[in-house]
């Protein structure tokens, strides 16, 4: 099961790194998105599978593939992938277990953020700020996924060169195989759904 989780997390990393078109704002499994015709056909199957697994959940039945994805939305996706928990029971235990003053305990994402912070999968934008509504970058998504599968144990993904370390690790693992390294900045800038 642990290897399956690692495989699924890396598969998601590849989808996000190559397309940056993945969203946390999907509807419940088995339902149609009211804007599914805007989903890039090459990613339809991945979206369908991850929705069916409960990894993608959301509100209003919209997928919004052209919208940017927030740090809170990615936290929800990473939590579901890392734990296999698509409910809220475990997550509810962590709503106040973080140092972030901008993550209220009653926010829908508070438990995800708290769990991932304690698991050392996410970091704040500062020691006390998470910026949940801020757009996430491809580098940040890759860092979270790599931490979820066991990388960055020695805090390599910190400091002024953290993006270089993330890209280097992802390249070594083959996640960025088809992306020219001179274009990492363009490709991994803002992640869209």
Locations of regions flagged by a protein language model:
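Feature responds to low-complexity, polar/acidic, surface-exposed segments characteristic
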Residues: 2-42, 53-72, 79-110, 119-139, ...
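Conserved glycosyltransferase catalytic-site signature
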Residues: 193
């Amino acid at each position: 099961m642990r290897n399956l989780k690692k495989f699924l997390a890396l598969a998601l990393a590849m989808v996000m790194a190559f397309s940056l078109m993945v969203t946390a704002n999907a509807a419940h499994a088995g339902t149609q998105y009211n804007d599914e015709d805007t989903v890039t056909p090459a990613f339809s199957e991945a979206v369908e599978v991850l929705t069916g697994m409960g990894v993608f959940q959301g509100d209003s039945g919209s997928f919004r593939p052209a919208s940017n994805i927030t740090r809170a939305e990615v936290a929800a996706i990473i939590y579901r992938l890392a734990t296999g928990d698509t409910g809220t029971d475990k997550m509810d235990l962590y709503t106040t277990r973080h140092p972030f003053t901008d993550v209220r305990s009653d926010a829908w994402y508070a438990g995800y953020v708290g769990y991932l912070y304690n698991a050392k999968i996410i970091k704040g934008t500062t020691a006390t700020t998470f910026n949940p509504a801020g757009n996430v970058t491809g580098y940040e998504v890759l860092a979270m996924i790599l931490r979820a599968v066991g990388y960055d144990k020695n805090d390599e993904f910190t400091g002024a060169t953290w993006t270089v370390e993330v890209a280097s690790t992802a390249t070594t693992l083959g996640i960025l195989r088809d992306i020219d390294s001179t274009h990492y900045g363009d490709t991994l800038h803002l992640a869209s759904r």
